[in-house]
From Swiss-Prot:
Protein's UniProt keywords contain Acetylation: no
Predominant place of localization: cytoplasm
Family annotation (SUPFAM superfamilies): Release factor
A Pfam entry, by short name: RF-1
Family that this chain belongs to: Belongs to the prokaryotic/mitochondrial release factor family.
Encoding gene, per UniProt annotation: prfA
Protein name (Swiss-Prot/TrEMBL): Peptide chain release factor 1
GO cellular component: cytoplasm
Post-translational modifications: Methylated by PrmC. Methylation increases the termination efficiency of RF1.
Protein's cellular compartments: Cytoplasm
One MF annotation (Gene Ontology) recorded for this entry: translation release factor activity, codon specific
Keywords noted in UniProt: Cytoplasm, Methylation, Protein biosynthesis
InterPro entries in the cross-refs: PCRF, Pep_chain_release_fac_I, Pep_chain_release_fac_I_sf, Prokaryotic/Mito_RF, RF-1
Length: 357
């Protein structure tokens, strides 16, 4: 681990030198990339430097603890105790900082909540979940924008979709995907019986706008004379353009303009629009598949968490965590729940890393 940390520190110092280089500073794209790389390594380098400093201080204090002056010895022993308490914690921090980063962690999210088993009660629960997430977002300074909703007449939602934007949202919210189960007595229940309902939650990183990269070698451009009704030639010059995108087989023809250059520009614009749409369709298909994998069918048995109102508890079944503060959680006080999930999955990743060597 420490050899890897030494390599990271060297890379960090190289990046610092690059940032001080006027040539890099004057190249906006290069400067942006170097700044991002430098910032990404900042936390781990700071922790490693603290670890090295504390290790050196420990050795110094061990020497001071041999001093003939009892006051110096006492002071050194106090320092040694503090350092020995801090070093193991710092080592654990470093292990976490060395875990591979999820490239999606910094992204905004799309939140989708759908009522599952349980009819109107499930729709009301979906509304409760949306309010819970909205208030949690508000407490973190995030922005929530409803994209689409299918409300019921009693204040529930068959479905609600929202975009949530802010800082590192996906890293905190990604473990919310799955089936959430509620156990409570519905307002319409006259016998006081507890009903079980469910809603599914999908958390997806918000897709960036797709940049269309069209390489010249991927295009075949043919020029020909524009034709009018009945195939007659309406132009004596080869101004019409046919562009074929070889990797996809998409073909665009433009012959409205008398200028070949204008026809080519129009055809390229149409081609790029079609390629962009095709890429977005592909992303949507992948997102739909991801959603299916995440949330299951909405059946009560496929649960990640249970909200039991009569007992005032919320239980996350993945990490066997039960909190007896359901009222606070459902009002958006989710920090303990979220941090426990992050900590659990970080521990799992550390175990996996140790097994992989």
């Amino acid at each position: 681990m420490f050899a890897k940390l030494e390599d990271i520190e060297r890379s960090f110092m190289d990046l610092e030198q690059e940032l001080a280089d006027p040539e890099v500073y004057n190249n906006q794209e290069r400067y942006r990339k170097v700044t991002m790389a430098h910032a990404e390594l900042g936390d781990v380098v700071a922790a490693f430097r603290e670890y090295k400093q504390l290790s050196a201080d420990l050795e110094d204090n061990k020497e001071m603890a041999k001093d003939s002056d009892p006051e110096i010895r006492e002071m050194a022993e106090m320092e040694i105790a503090e350092i020995k308490d801090r070093l193991p914690k710092l080592e654990e921090e470093l292990k976490l900082l060395l875990l591979p980063k999820d490239p999606m962690d910094g992204k905004n999210i799309i939140l989708e909540i759908r009522a599952g088993t349980g009819g109107e009660e499930a729709a009301l629960f979906a509304a409760d979940l949306f309010r819970m997430y909205s208030r949690f977002a508000e407490s973190n300074g995030w922005k929530v924008e409803v994209m689409n909703s299918n409300p019921t007449g009693t204040g529930g939602f068959k479905e609600i979709i929202a975009a949530i934007s802010g800082s590192r949202i996906y890293s905190m919210m990604k473990y919310e995907s799955g089936t959430h189960r509620v156990q409570r007595v519905p307002a319409t229940e006259t016998q006081g019986r507890i009903h079980t309902s469910a809603a599914t939650v999908a958390i997806m990183p918000e897709a960036e706008e797709v940049d269309v990269q069209v390489r010249n070698e991927d295009l075949r451009i043919d020029v020909f004379r524009a034709s009018g009704p009945g195939g007659q030639s309406v132009n004596t010059t080869d101004s019409a353009i046919r562009i074929t995108h070889l990797p996809t087989g998409l073909v665009v023809i433009c012959q409205d303009e008398k200028s070949q250059h204008k026809n080519k520009a129009k055809a390229m614009k149409v081609l790029c629009s079609r390629l962009l749409q095709a890429e977005q369709d592909k992303q949507h298909a992948e997102m739909a598949e991801q959603r299916r994998a995440q949330v299951g069918s909405g059946d009560r048995s496929e649960r990640i968490r249970t909200y039991n109102f009569p007992q005032g508890r919320v239980t996350d079944h993945r990490i066997n965590l039960t909190l007896y503060k359901l009222d606070a959680v459902i009002e958006g006080d989710m920090q303990e729940l979220v941090e426990s999930l992050i900590s659990h999955y970080q521990s799992e990743a550390l175990k996996q890393q140790a097994q992989d060597g």
